[in-house]
């Protein structure tokens, strides 16, 4: 029963260190395998318009990182696959579940992408199950990620339909207001929801949303994630597609949710908002810092690679770990 499940979120958890067995943190291996491919880090920038565009996707793929291209330039998806494949890079795109997407998936047979993410807000749906089955029938070699979901039942159903990975997280993101608009979601207990879902999963889980610090990546892996999708920490960089705005001499970048009126172009079924983030430096610098911090996490876990993070002990400290600190 759910009521017996402990409820906590990222800021409520501290991982407990083990004896370090490596000489330097730089020896720690942060690579992860998803399907037939290995990637430098178990993180993926959110497939949102203010986070990723074709140039960012190409940069990430060339540097050995996983990426998922957003689905909001529908006509550009086939040329994008071609562009990536011509350079010997993996193609990873998103689709929705509307009727015309079925024809689109069938049209990919000639040049199938390596990864397709079925990307809708409430992924525990018959429409998603049907789309998984259609993709698997038409493109059997393509790795299918389906989401978003927040329960073990949803994970099992999507896996049984043929999904190769599920994306867990309903509204915990910084620019997501699902919990406010609908009363539903995993906001405030995303890490516990991840743990709950991971116990039921037989295939990889991508934790999506609620990541506010690099330490949250290690916590996600501890509670069952194979990969961690991150929005706000990847927003606001020089390469980020979001519009740059100057306020009182300080530069900011737009960051908005995929279900916001700014993305939709209309105020209808809005479950996202727009915020301004102080402009950051280069995306590559953030990725390097994430890698170094994760290597430190592995050293504290007493291991050599990210699998060691799955077995560490933890304590629930209920909102006290900040102790007045900020980063």
Swiss-Prot record:
Record GO cellular component, one term: cytosol
Oxidoreductase is among the record's keywords: yes
Any Gene Ontology biological process: purine nucleotide metabolic process
Classification via CDD domains: IMPDH
SMART domains cross-referenced by the UniProt entry: IMPDH
Binding residue positions for NADP(+): 205-228
InterPro entries xref list: Aldolase_TIM (IPR013785), GMP_reductase (IPR050139), GuaC_type_2 (IPR005994), IMP_DH/GMP_Rdtase_CS (IPR015875), IMP_DH_GMPRt (IPR001093)
Keywords per UniProt: NADP, Oxidoreductase
GO molecular function, one term: GMP reductase activity
GTP-binding listed as a keyword: no
Record-linked Pfam families: IMPDH (PF00478)
Reaction(s) this enzyme catalyzes, per UniProt: IMP + NH4(+) + NADP(+) = GMP + NADPH + 2 H(+)
Active site per the UniProt annotation: 176
EC assignment: 1.7.1.7
Function of the protein: Catalyzes the irreversible NADPH-dependent deamination of GMP to IMP. It functions in the conversion of nucleobase, nucleoside and nucleotide derivatives of G to A nucleotides, and in maintaining the intracellular balance of A and G nucleotides.
Recorded family membership: Belongs to the IMPDH/GMPR family. GuaC type 2 subfamily.
PANTHER family: GMP REDUCTASE (PTHR43170:SF5)
Name of protein: GMP reductase
Gene: guaC
């Amino acid at each position: 029963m759910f009521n017996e499940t402990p409820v906590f979120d990222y800021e409520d958890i501290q991982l407990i260190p083990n004896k370090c067995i490596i000489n330097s943190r730089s020896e720690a291996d942060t690579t992860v395998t998803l399907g037939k491919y290995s990637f430098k880090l178990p993180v993926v920038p959110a497939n949102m318009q203010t986070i990723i565009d074709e140039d960012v996707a190409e940069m990430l793929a060339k540097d050995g990182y996983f990426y998922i291209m957003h689905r909001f330039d529908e006509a550009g998806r086939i040329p994008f696959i071609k562009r990536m494949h011509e350079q010997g890079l993996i193609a990873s795109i998103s689709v929705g579940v509307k009727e015309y997407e079925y024809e689109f998936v069938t049209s990919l047979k000639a040049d199938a992408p390596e990864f397709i993410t079925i990307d809708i807000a409430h992924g525990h749906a018959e429409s998603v199950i049907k789309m998984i089955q259609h993709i698997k029938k038409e493109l059997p070699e393509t790795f299918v990620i389906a989401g978003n979901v927040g329960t073990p039942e949803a994970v099992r159903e999507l896996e049984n339909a043929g999904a190769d990975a599920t994306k867990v997280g309903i509204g915990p993101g910084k620019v997501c207001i699902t919990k406010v608009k609908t009363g539903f979601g995993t906001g405030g207990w995303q890490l516990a929801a991840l743990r709950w879902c991971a116990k039921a999963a037989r295939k990889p889980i991508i934790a999506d949303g609620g990541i506010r610090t690099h330490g949250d990546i290690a916590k996600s892996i501890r509670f069952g994630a194979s990969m961690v999708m991150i929005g706000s920490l990847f927003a606001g960089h020089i390469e980020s597609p979001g519009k740059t705005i100057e306020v009182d001499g300080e530069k900011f970048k737009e960051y908005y949710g995929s279900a916001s009126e700014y993305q939709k172009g209309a105020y209808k079924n809005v479950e996202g908002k727009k915020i301004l983030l102080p402009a950051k430096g280069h995306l590559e610098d953030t990725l390097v810092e994430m890698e170094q911090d994760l290597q430190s996490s592995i050293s504290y876990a007493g291991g050599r690679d990210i699998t060691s993070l799955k077995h560490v002990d933890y304590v629930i400290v209920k909102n006290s770990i900040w102790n007045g600190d900020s980063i």
